[in-house]
A protein has these predicted regions:
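Short solvent-exposed strand/turn elements
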Residues: 33-57
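Short N-terminal edge-element motif at the start of the domain
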Residues: 1-32
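Beta-strand-rich cores of mature extracytoplasmic or soluble domains
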Residues: 55-154
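Aromatic-residue detector
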Residues: 23, 44-46, 70
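Surface loops and adjacent helix of pleckstrin homology
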Residues: 17, 26, 36-38, 104, ...
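Intrinsically disordered, charged low-complexity linkers and terminal tails
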Residues: 11, 30, 39, 153-154
Length: 154
């Protein structure tokens, strides 16, 4: 398979368990993808995919799509169904009072740990961890990666 490039608007199919799958979409700012809130065994059109609620938005390593682990199955231009890229947080592991909130361009501002509650830690996700997060969501259980990376309140 030819190397797949990051192209905003591209819809990706994520195999969840060998029987069912979810969908993600490449967003305007590399390497962010929106993962949609549906695990199914049905094939959805790109228009049906972008009509679904977004479950989460995370940056992912290129290994997820470069060699076809998450194959491209269509595209919907970003302008037709925009998805906002959320802010993320960073927290110093030795001084948990030292936090920053970052936008999708990497611009940072100081923040308190309390301001970071509800935000995801700034990290690039492996395909396997996104797939595990989807399985955990489907099984209605907490995801270890999400729990481990939550902001530490002091």
């Amino acid at each position: 398979m030819a190397r797949q490039r990051f192209e905003p608007g591209t819809i990706l199919r994520i195999d969840v368990d060998g029987r069912s799958h979810a969908y993600a979409r490449m967003l305007a700012h590399h390497p962010h993808v929106a993962v949609y809130d549906r695990i199914t065994d049905a094939e959805l059109s790109p228009e049906e995919v972008v009509a679904l609620p977004v479950l989460f938005v995370v940056p992912v390593f290129g290994r997820a799509y470069h060699k076809g682990r998450w194959p491209k199955v269509g595209a919907v231009p970003i302008e037709q169904a925009p998805v906002e890229i959320p802010e993320y947080f960073m927290q110093d592991m030795f001084n948990p009072h030292d936090c920053q909130i970052l936008d999708h361009s990497g611009n940072a501002r100081p923040a308190t740990p309390e301001e970071c509650v509800g935000l995801e830690r700034a990290a690039v996700w492996d395909a396997e961890h996104v797939e595990e997060r989807l399985r955990d969501r489907d099984a209605n259980r907490p995801n270890a990666h999400v729990e481990r990376t939550k902001v530490r309140l002091v």
